[in-house]
From Swiss-Prot:
Disulfide bonds: none annotated. Belongs to the phosphorylase b kinase regulatory chain family. It comes from Drosophila melanogaster. A lipid is attached at residue 1090 (S-farnesyl cysteine). One of its GO terms (molecular function) is calmodulin binding. Phosphorylase b kinase catalyzes the phosphorylation of serine in certain substrates, including troponin I. The beta chain acts as a regulatory unit and modulates the activity of the holoenzyme in response to phosphorylation. The keyword Cell membrane applies. It comes from the Eukaryota. GO terms for cellular component: plasma membrane. GO terms for biological process: glycogen metabolic process; positive regulation of glycogen catabolic process. Its main location: membrane. It is found in: Cell membrane. Pathway: Glycan biosynthesis; glycogen metabolism. This is Probable phosphorylase b kinase regulatory subunit beta.
């Protein structure tokens, strides 16, 4: 019989053999050590003998099933048809880990070379399969959808596609990311995997493929999307984490290894990396909207990805997984996972609605995750964890006919305490691969630095710096200073600034350095990854963000500094608001300082244009620059200096992929305005732009008049807003190319837009902007930020159908929604709601507490809250439509923080209920309370004619699940008056408290909230001698004015509502103490809590 390899604390008994004794050698330390010294702890011959045993296991259990043609591996050893990319990468990693272990041996008799080349064959086989699908990569860069996704399954021996898109969920971002991650690890170890420039270009395009993981709903590691298995993809934290790790690993990597050239280096968009990082850490400890906890996060937070080094967050997430998914024979993948369980109908691809309930308590248990925890313990040098999970793993091991240890794929509980084991004749290759890696580590044959040559397990600031001159992640500097260069548009502006002690430079003074807009940099990056042979176009036209514009670039001998997006003169009107620009500059500097992760200091270019100094608020800009000059911006260290003096300490990115022939003359570089005389000496000499004021006049009566009458009206009116409306009527009737006096409608509106903008007449600016179908720049990432914080967005006019943003959308899709569902009902709101969406995205990223208790941010209702606040504060004459963008942002912050200032500003209870009701804000644990009410109310809850049923709600969903919370929120939003909506929330909390304190009580009938409110109001009227005529039950309080009741203090309404609820008990036995009358939900332990905060 075969000898059994020794490992740390794990013994495997073979037929006729003895148990492997625990190895007393040290457990792998995280510190750098001399590997030769490490070897001395074991006898050389014994090491060779053990490695040879593992070589035999790898040959028999892995390489035996590798396709000799493509190099791919199947999922199960008995499968001769389907090769799986993810499983192939993990198999290759096990083979490679043994290759790494053999490299210590002087004479391995060719085994090391064979193992290394087998690894290369697999990785190149995957690459070749994907290169055949290069057209998909090209399409996916433009639109991230399943029909354009790279396939994750191929024909095992030919590498051809095997499952059409409509029959398999190929969109798995984590799969491509995993490949890139191990590609870098293996190249770093010395393997030559990438051979040609064509392949370099393709890998660069794979980077573009995964860059937008943060906004790409996919089907995840388990290939099924949402836990409901209904074909719906969703955003997965595990996919985003894998992508984040892959981007970090491959940034600046030379794919040709030590023999590489400048054109074989891979570049990563640092802003895309940062979005993936921030959204990934925001989602934790959740996996997705439907899965509150998932075992895939173990592989993301530990080996192989090590996607986060926020210790507290990582430990919280791991403990969440261990506590809720760990079982006797393995980990569940997630709760109510029906895959391979005894109740799953294998003949159907998708589940029926409500079917998940049948899988509760019958989820398969996967020993694979015991091994993952063992490997995690080795990296953390946690011997207790290693031993604990090795003991668990022993129960799941068996031996094959060769005496080799085999890890069972899964155990399926049968409901009575026993298990059905996976078929024994087939090996689960992913599990075997992990087992081999764990054994090599715990036996002391493989060091963690050999398994992880790029040191992913260490925080970025502790990793060895990659050789070369390309940017590298280094972690957060403790003494980070944001460098600032002030560029004045002209010499007279420079002279005027000097009068106030602000030293600036003109574009001429910084020469030969050029000042570019980020759009010019986008054009340069479009050359990165271009390959006509494969059909790849390079980097898509994605904006360069704040971090990207904080680098200094070297391009074909030129030095270039880019100014941030906030200084771009775009179609959308926000750039015209000086107060908003000042606030954005502060936000920009804070953002760069907080999220900078590269070596070298960030250098931010601030532009000062002549039109800025004509703005009435330019003095505030001078105050900001004076503050920056002192070296601080809201606690962030900054340094203003001459560009030539700051370059040496900047982060410099060498864009060596550019050829001189590809570089066109940059006519759009920021240029200096020259004047014959310097002129202005101070602000008092500068002519100011006037703030335009005119009466709001409606021209609705022209809707029915003929076009010639409207044209005559155009000639006779001086009102800008009237002109906007009249041109809008002509646009709707005649189209954008209709001409009036040689001027087409589009051109006339554009001219009017700029005229209104220069006058800061915001109502007219917004009206024209909407007619021109403008869209806010880079709005998509802000919507995604809202979504990953566990919220949803809706846009639309109150009283009309709303459109829900529940998944990331492209700018074109957003534009279509705004101008089809909003503009037909209110022209200005089509752009005003875009503004509010943008501000919500920014605020939730920096101040998530502002949105606590709000599950769905309904933009139409948020604007209604703003209008109510203006009325409350005595500013009825002010129209939200005519506020400046900065004022809109401040007003938004005001209504979102009502609880902080309500007492100080002496809000009445009614006013507070109106504001909170518009936002549909609920108290902590509110949705869990509704779940408990439904458990005791078989007939459900009724309000305003809307029914929230207990069945199938309780069977289809689980407590705390985002889908359930949204269903409850939909019920509340059916209540049309915000103050009534809020008092209904209070009533539900009171009912929940009554049920909680009286566990024997259950509702026999539907819980009629309108009826209880009517009863409470009647009590109030009686107590206060108010004449009140009760209405028929079907009309009860539907439209009744309860303003006096809504205005009562919280303590008084609580008393009336509680009395009314108790009265219902006394009046007709609506409560039952007989538990048999109530079909209770058994879901006590199943609690996928999604934070609604």
């Amino acid at each position: 019989m075969r000898d059994v390899p020794k490992s740390l604390g794990l013994s495997v008994t073979t037929p006729g053999g003895s148990s492997g004794a625990p190895d007393s050698g040290r457990h792998n330390s995280l510190e750098e050590i001399n590997l030769d010294q490490f070897l001395k702890t074991s006898n050389y011959e014994d090491t060779v003998k053990q490695l040879d045993i593992y070589y035999g296991i790898v040959k028999r259990q892995l390489l035996r099933y590798q396709s000799p043609i493509t190099g791919l591996f199947p999922v199960m050893s008995t499968d001769q048809v389907v090769g799986s990319v993810r499983d192939s990468v993990y198999c290759a990693s096990a083979v490679w880990s043994l290759y790494q272990a053999y490299r210590r041996i002087d004479d391995d008799r060719g085994k090391s070379y064979e193992l290394g080349q087998s690894t290369v064959k697999c990785m190149r086989g995957i690459l070749e399969c994907w290169v055949k699908q290069a057209s998909r990569v090209e399409l996916f860069k433009q639109r991230q959808s399943n029909q354009h996704a790279l396939h994750s399954k191929f024909q095992l021996h030919t590498g051809e596609k095997i499952y059409p898109d409509e029959f398999y969920n190929h969109l798995q971002i984590d799969c491509v990311s995993l490949y890139l991650l191990f590609l870098v690890q293996m190249i770093t170890s010395g393997l030559q995997i990438i051979y040609t420039h064509d392949e370099v270009a393709f890998v660069q395009n794979l980077v573009y493929y995964v860059e937008r993981a943060y906004r790409t709903p996919d089907f995840g590691m388990w290939e099924r999307g949402s836990k409901y298995n209904n074909g719906t993809p969703e955003i997965h934290a595990s996919s985003i984490g894998m992508a984040k790790s892959a981007l970090e690993a491959i940034n600046g990597c030379n794919l040709f290894g030590e023999k590489g050239a400048s054109w074989s280096v891979v570049y990563v968009d640092i802003d895309a990396h940062n979005r993936n990082r921030s959204i990934f850490e925001t989602m934790l400890p959740r996996e997705s909207s439907s899965k509150g906890v998932d075992a895939s996060l173990l592989l993301t937070l530990s080996f192989p990805a090590f996607a986060s080094h926020e210790d507290r967050l990582v430990e919280q997430t791991k403990q969440n997984v261990v506590n809720r998914l760990r079982c006797k024979m393995g980990f569940k993948r997630f709760t109510r996972d029906g895959f391979l369980s005894k109740n799953e109908d294998k003949s159907r691809r998708y589940y029926h609605s409500g079917e998940l309930k049948e899988f509760e308590g019958l989820e398969c248990e996967w020993p694979l995750f015991f091994i993952a925890m063992i490997i995690d313990g080795v990296f953390k040098n946690n011997n207790e964890q290693i031993e604990e999970f090795q003991n668990d793993l022993r129960r799941c091991l068996r031996t094959d006919v060769n005496g080799d240890p085999v890890v069972t794929m899964y155990y399926a509980p049968d409901g009575d305490g026993s298990y059905m084991r996976a078929p024994s004749q087939s090996l689960f290759l992913w599990g075997q691969s992990f087992f081999i890696i764990a054994q090599l580590l715990t036996a002391g044959l493989l060091h963690i630095n050999e398994l992880d040559p790029i040191r992913r397990y260490l925080p970025s600031y502790n990793r060895p710096r990659r050789a070369g001159r390309y940017s590298a992640f280094q972690g957060t500097a403790t003494d980070l200073v944001v460098q600032i260069v002030l560029i004045a548009e002209s010499m007279r502006l420079q002279a005027m600034m000097a009068t106030y002690g602000i030293q600036t430079q003109t574009p001429h003074e910084v020469e030969p350095v050029q000042i570019w807009s980020s759009t010019e940099l986008i054009k340069v990056y479009q050359h990165l990854g271009v390959n006509n042979k494969v059909g790849l176009s390079g980097r898509p036209c994605r904006p360069v963000g704040s971090l990207g514009t904080s680098k200094v670039y070297r391009i074909c001998g030129m030095t270039v500094l880019c100014y941030p997006l906030i200084f771009e003169v775009s179609d959308f009107y926000l750039y015209r608001d000086m107060a908003l620009l000042i606030d954005d500059i502060k936000t920009e500097l804070q953002f760069v300082g907080k999220y900078w992760r590269l070596s070298g200091r960030p250098t931010v270019c601030l532009l000062i244009r002549e039109e800025h100094m004509r703005d009435p608020q330019f003095k505030e800009m001078l105050d900001l620059l004076a503050m920056l000059k002192k070296g601080y911006c809201d606690g962030m260290k900054v340094r203003i200096g001459r560009l030539q003096n700051l370059i040496s300490s900047s982060c410099i990115e060498h864009l060596d992929f550019m050829n001189q022939s590809d570089l066109t003359d940059n006519e759009n570089a920021f240029s200096q305005i020259n004047h014959e005389y310097i002129g202005y000496q101070s602000l008092t000499d500068v002519p100011k732009a006037l703030t335009y004021v005119e009466e709001k006049i409606s021209v609705a009566h022209f809707d029915t008049k003929p076009t010639p009458d409207i044209i005559n009206a155009l000639r006779s009116t001086d009102s800008i807003y009237c002109l906007c409306q009249l041109w809008g009527i002509i646009l709707n009737r005649e189209g954008p190319h209709f001409e009036v006096n040689g001027l087409n409608v589009n051109t006339a509106l554009t001219q009017l837009y700029h005229r209104a903008g220069s006058l800061r007449y915001w109502r007219a600016v917004r009206y024209c902007s909407s007619l021109l179908h403008h869209i806010v720049d880079s709005i998509s990432p802000f919507i995604t930020t809202v979504l990953v914080n566990g919220k949803e967005l809706t846009v639309g006019i109150i009283g009309q159908k709303e459109t829900v943003f529940d998944k990331p959308m492209t700018p074109a899709e957003i534009q279509n929604v705004m101008y089809t569902s909003v503009q037909p009902y209110d022209v200005i709101q089509a752009v005003l709601q875009q503004e509010v969406v943008l501000y919500c995205g920014r605020l939730i990223a920096t101040n998530p507490s502002m949105f606590r208790g709000i599950l769905k941010i309904r933009i139409g209702w948020v604007l209604e809250a703003m209008r109510i606040y203006l009325q409350i504060s005595g500013q009825q004459s002010i129209d939200v439509d005519n506020l400046s963008p900065f004022q809109v942002r401040i007003l938004l912050q005001k209504v979102l923080t009502v609880s902080e200032w309500a007492v100080e500003e002496k809000l009445t209870t009614l006013q507070r209920r109106q504001l909170e009701g518009c936002l549909c804000r609920v108290p902590k644990h509110f949705y869990n309370k509704i779940w408990e009410i439904l458990q005791r109310t078989p007939q459900g809850i009724l309000t305003q004619g809307h029914h929230l049923p207990a069945t199938p709600t309780l069977t289809n969903m689980s407590r705390g699940e985002l889908t359930f919370n949204l269903l409850v929120e939909e019920t509340l939003i059916c209540i049309d008056r915000p103050e009534r909506r809020q008092i209904t929330v209070e009533l539900l909390c009171i009912v929940a408290t009554i049920l909680n304190r009286n566990p024997e009580l259950h509702f026999k009938q539907a819980l009629d909230l309108d009826g209880i409110l009517a009863e409470a109001f009647a009590m109030y009227c009686k107590d206060n001698n108010i004449q009140h005529q009760p209405k028929p039950e079907h009309e009860q309080t539907k439209n009744e004015d309860l303003k006096a009741f809504y205005s009562l203090p919280y303590s008084e309404t609580t008393g009336y509502l509680a009395r009314a609820a108790v009265n219902k008990v006394l009046q007709g036995g609506i409560f039952s103490t007989n538990e048999e009358d109530v079909q209770l939900d058994g879901d006590r332990l199943h609690d996928d809590n999604c934070k609604v905060s």
